[in-house]
């Protein structure tokens, strides 16, 4: 019997704010992880056992950014299916409002940076660039 294909589920946060009429997003610069260190990514992480997508995003935001998100303020804006990496990234958007993100995992994050959504740093992970492109076009699903 053929074994079922299994994917890891990842919740990524697209935190946005409006600065001088331009949409900005929060990026996290990786360090000491052994994977894509020195590159910017969206904050987030894998679901844990018995956790739903929103619970994972709320937990990850608290662990990585020190902020308390509410389920009703999160909206799924994109799903990326990685065939080769065997995972699915769910991108959840929230507006910054009065939240003040800060680096909580100093051993894994070198910097938090607000950037214009249409002017990402050169060293942004390729998957993030692709995801942002799809979100800007209003497309909910992509594969890589």
Residue ranges, per PLM feature:
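Conserved N-terminal beta-strand and adjoining loop/helix that marks the start
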Residues: 1-25, 77-79, 93
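NUDIX/MutT-family hydrolases
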Residues: 93, 103-136
């Amino acid at each position: 019997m053929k074994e079922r294909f299994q994917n890891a589920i990842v919740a990524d946060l697209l935190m946005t704010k409006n600065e001088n009429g331009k949409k900005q997003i929060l990026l996290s610069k990786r360090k000491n992880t052994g994977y894509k260190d020195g590159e910017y990514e969206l904050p987030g992480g894998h679901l844990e056992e018995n956790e739903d997508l929103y619970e994972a995003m709320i937990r990850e935001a608290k662990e990585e950014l020190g902020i308390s998100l509410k389920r009703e303020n999160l909206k799924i804006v994109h799903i990326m299916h990685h065939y080769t990496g065997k995972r699915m990234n769910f991108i959840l958007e929230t507006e910054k409002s009065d939240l003040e993100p800060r680096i909580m995992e100093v051993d894994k994050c070198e910097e938090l940076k607000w950037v214009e959504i249409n002017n990402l740093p050169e060293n942004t992970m390729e998957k993030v660039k692709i995801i942002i492109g799809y979100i800007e076009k209003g497309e909910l699903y992509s594969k890589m």
